[in-house]
């Protein structure tokens, strides 16, 4: 079973759009253990501690449907999974090179703030799938 206390989102910058912040807060109420940190820069050494999994979001990454994403996250067993979202310039190639996976949410390009909301919804959906919750309908 996938649990939100094993998942964290680290993003560069703050959410400025109120409607996106409201959407994120709705999912945070459903997953209070999910860590969401707004940073100025990524410190890969801290995020890598204890063999944590690093997943960078980037439009050139690998795409999964929701069920596949759930399976992928479940395969990481009891490791902590850190999702990294860059700012308007994305994530540096150095950080991408040192990540375990580069994930694309879609072939479309999204503003980084909207990507956070989409990722949080997909995390909630993956947890729901792993718990056989009726939220996900395939």
Swiss-Prot record:
Enzyme Commission identifier(s): 2.1.1.177
Compartments in which it is found: Cytoplasm
Cellular component terms (Gene Ontology): cytoplasm
GO terms assigned for molecular function: rRNA (pseudouridine-N3-)-methyltransferase activity
Enzymatic reactions: pseudouridine(1915) in 23S rRNA + S-adenosyl-L-methionine = N(3)-methylpseudouridine(1915) in 23S rRNA + S-adenosyl-L-homocysteine + H(+)
Entry keyword Methyltransferase: yes
Binding site for S-adenosyl-L-methionine: 57, 86, 105-110
First-listed, main subcellular location of the protein, grouped into a coarse class: cytoplasm
Record keywords, A-Z: Cytoplasm, Methyltransferase, rRNA processing, S-adenosyl-L-methionine, Transferase
Signal peptide: none
Pfam family, one: SPOUT_MTase
HAMAP family: 23SrRNA_methyltr_H
Family statement: Belongs to the RNA methyltransferase RlmH family.
Binding partners and assembly: Homodimer.
Function, as annotated: Specifically methylates the pseudouridine at position 1915 (m3Psi1915) in 23S rRNA.
Protein name: Ribosomal RNA large subunit methyltransferase H
Native species: Prochlorococcus marinus (strain MIT 9312)
